[in-house]
């Protein structure tokens, strides 16, 4: 096992695909500070790395046989994450304990499963039930130091894209590479009675009272192997210890709560004018743009709405530049809400974005409410 761990370290520390995937989905705060040298050269997207990365992810779900060459590394990751959790359970009393209940919304796989729409849904429903929720997040992709309070006026460059969606809730919301520090800041400055952590299932420095795992109902767990041979951050046995499993779009299995994600409205990025899905004001031949872990889900949604789309996929959390969406034709461009948040300053009048709303079966909120009441 020590040999596999040593080789895994080399694989992760190399400046390549697996380093990028690992840093995105496993690291919670930077361990070292690197000196950044500014350059006057024009920015050129690393499309080779992005393309190769998508090939690796696709291979996980196509169950490609070559991935078994990485099986020893997968065993090492599975061992490491299991040991990390066992250490947490053994020393949980020594970890930071929030004054109010903590709800973790996370997943077992690398890539997007719909955590942020679910966090928004849970927060909205808790407010309806009389709770005063707050939110903490890592703020992936944001450029900020220490703890940052996010409002609907905080620039996307500081917050990262996903935080922009949650900022519209107008509730206490803090981001920090160190989630525990964000928790402490929120508790010290606000009178919240429940806190939701967007992601953080594997962040065992943080105690938790409720664990919710979101799974992609279509792709599920791919080849069921741990990173880097597959998409799993932890063993599938981890599902036995969580409180709720929410299945994004189904089909569901026993014990899973179905979450449906529905299109809400189209919003023109420059003018802010909004239209219902039924009242789209232009022709339906469009460019569809998505920088998601699973862009196909967004493209399929537009196709079901009757659009004739040209697919333009980008990597998850892609930092868009104006050239990325500069198409020579005059077709409208439809993006996701989180991608559009990074294009507000572009001189492009063709960009629209589609807002979505998540909804989970009523029994889910009933059970969550009951569990929270039993904690008090």
Language model segments and positions:
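Residue-level signal for inorganic ion chemistry
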Residues: 76, 116, 166, 198, ...
């Amino acid at each position: 096992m020590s040999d596999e761990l040593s080789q895994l370290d080399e694989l992760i520390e190399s400046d390549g695909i697996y380093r990028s995937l690992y840093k995105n989905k496993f690291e919670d705060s930077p361990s070292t500070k690197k000196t950044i040298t500014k350059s006057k050269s024009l920015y050129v997207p690393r499309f080779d790395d992005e393309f190769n990365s998508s090939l690796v992810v696709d291979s996980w779900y196509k169950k490609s046989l070559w991935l078994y060459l990485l099986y020893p590394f997968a065993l090492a990751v599975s061992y490491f994450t299991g040991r990390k959790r066992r250490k947490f359970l053994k020393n949980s009393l020594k970890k930071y304990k929030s004054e109010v209940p903590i709800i973790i919304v996370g997943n077992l796989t690398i890539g997007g499963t719909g955590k942020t729409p679910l966090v928004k849904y849970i927060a909205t429903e808790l407010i309806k039930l009389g709770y005063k929720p707050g939110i903490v997040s890592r703020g992936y992709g944001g450029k900020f130091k220490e703890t940052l309070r996010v409002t609907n006026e905080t620039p996307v460059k500081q917050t990262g894209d996903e935080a922009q969606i949650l900022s519209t809730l107008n509730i206490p919301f803090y981001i920090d590479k160190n989630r525990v520090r964000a928790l402490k800041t929120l508790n010290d400055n606000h009178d919240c009675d429940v806190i939701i952590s967007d992601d953080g299932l594997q962040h065992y420095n943080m105690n938790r009272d409720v664990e919710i795992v979101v799974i992609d109902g279509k792709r599920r767990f791919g080849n069921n192997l741990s990173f880097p041979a597959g998409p799993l951050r932890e063993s599938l046995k981890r599902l036995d210890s969580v409180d709720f499993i929410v299945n994004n779009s189904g089909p569901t299995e026993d014990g899973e709560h179905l979450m449906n994600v529905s299109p809400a409205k189209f919003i023109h990025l420059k003018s802010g004018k909004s239209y219902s899905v039924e009242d789209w004001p232009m022709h339906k031949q469009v460019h569809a743009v998505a920088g998601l872990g699973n862009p196909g889900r967004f493209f399929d949604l537009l196709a079901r709405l009757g659009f004739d789309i040209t697919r333009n996929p980008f990597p998850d959390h892609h930092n868009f530049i104006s050239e990325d969406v500069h198409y020579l034709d005059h077709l409208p461009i439809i993006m996701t809400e989180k991608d559009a948040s990074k294009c507000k300053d572009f001189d492009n009048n063709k960009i629209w974005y589609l807002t979505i709303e998540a909804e989970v079966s009523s029994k889910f909120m009933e059970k969550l409410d009951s569990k929270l009441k039993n904690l008090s």
